[in-house]
Amino acid sequence: MASLINQAAWQPKARTRSLQVGPGPTPSPNEHEIVIKVAYAAVNPTDWKMQDTPYFELEYPFIWGTDVAGTIVQLGSEVTQFKVGQRVIGHCDSLLTRKVTNAGFQLYTTVREILVAEIPDSLPLANAAVLPLSVSTAASALYVQLDLPFPSLSPKSTGKRIVIWGGSSSVGSSAIQLAVASGLEVVATASQANHDLVRSLGASQVFDHRAPSVIDQMASVLQPGDYVVDCIGSPDTQAKCGELVGRIGGGTLPVMLWPQGGLPQNVRAVFVNGLDPGMVNLDVGNAVWRKFIPEALAAGKFQAKPDPRIVPGGLEKVQEGIDMLRQGVSAQKIVIEISRSE
């Protein structure tokens, strides 16, 4: 096929809040990669955190961006499950590969096949863009760290409960739905304004995380052997979740922030790597990305939540979207309109 003319929003150097739009890398997929024309790309906390204080050294200029939704334009030679023209979501992994071709904030991105899922025509691409990183991260917490049963459209009850701390967050929204599809009863936290949203995702009980007695309230409905996941990733939420796990007999606590220490001795905090399902535990990637997510979206049994807050205007607006998220949002995800595809 003819060479694709790409454009990208580049980070010119470390620790600067000014992206520059210019020619992007030419996509050249390996045998197991897919080239997606990006219609929408979501912004995640990693984007502004890497812009302000990078976790590790990178060669600049670089391109951020993890969540994309768009249309397949090219397939690697060994890709058989997909076809050109399909509407898909993709989890971009440039922070792992260190390759800008694998980043999301560009017109064409290259994504590994196991982290791509077809979406139904009924799901707008802008809404679908909120899903990739949240699905992968929630899947890593539930199926890698906690070893829960894989999700199913017809789950069997495990008789267990799981606390999703931060139920209206992006990761929390996916974690609630995956946990329900794995046969668990979900107990969640959220601000009072977001209780209805969290219940609509499948939580049977929702507690106000600001309530002084929230730990006591939640501990009263849990039993030893139940689970807790911190989907917020702050020192405060990690400490509260650790206390809760300790109160019900101890166990593993998946966290979105490196373990901070100071937790009860019977609690083992483990950092959740959102790229694990596509890199290491491929059985998780296959069960979630290849099987469950496409089927559940098509059947209307998985919601793309939280709702997108769409920023139109193309790649020139990526920095604006990053700045908006840096200031904070609630029960929304910032989504940039990269190109007009629908």
UniProtKB/Swiss-Prot annotation:
EC number assigned by the record: 1.-.-.-
Pathway assigned to this chain's UniProt record = Secondary metabolite biosynthesis
Q: Does the keyword Nucleotide-binding apply?
A: yes
Question: Which family, according to the similarity comment?
Answer: Belongs to the zinc-containing alcohol dehydrogenase family.
Q: Binding of NADP(+): at which residues?
A: 46-49, 168-171, 191-194, 255-256, 329-330
Source domain of life is: Eukaryota
Native species: Aspergillus japonicus
- Functional summary from the UniProt entry: Trans-enoyl reductase; part of the him gene cluster that mediates the biosynthesis of himeic acid A, a ubiquitin-activating enzyme (E1) inhibitor. First, himA, together with the trans-enoyl reductase himH, catalyzes the formation of apolyketide chain, which is then condensed with leucine by the NRPS activity of himA. Dieckmann cyclization and release from himA gives a tetramic acid intermediate as the product of himA PKS-NRPS. HimG then catalyzes alpha-oxidation of the tetramic acid ring, with a subsequent rearrangement to yield apyrone intermediate.
Pfam families the UniProt entry points to: ADH_N (PF08240), ADH_zinc_N (PF00107)
Matching InterPro entries: ADH-like_C, ADH-like_N, GroES-like_sf, NAD(P)-bd_dom_sf, PKS_ER, Trans-enoyl_RdTase-like
Q: What is an example of a GO molecular function annotated in this UniProt entry?
A: nucleotide binding
Query: Could you say which enzyme class this protein belongs to?
Result: oxidoreductase
Q: What is this protein called?
A: Trans-enoyl reductase himH
Q: Which residues form a coiled coil?
A: none
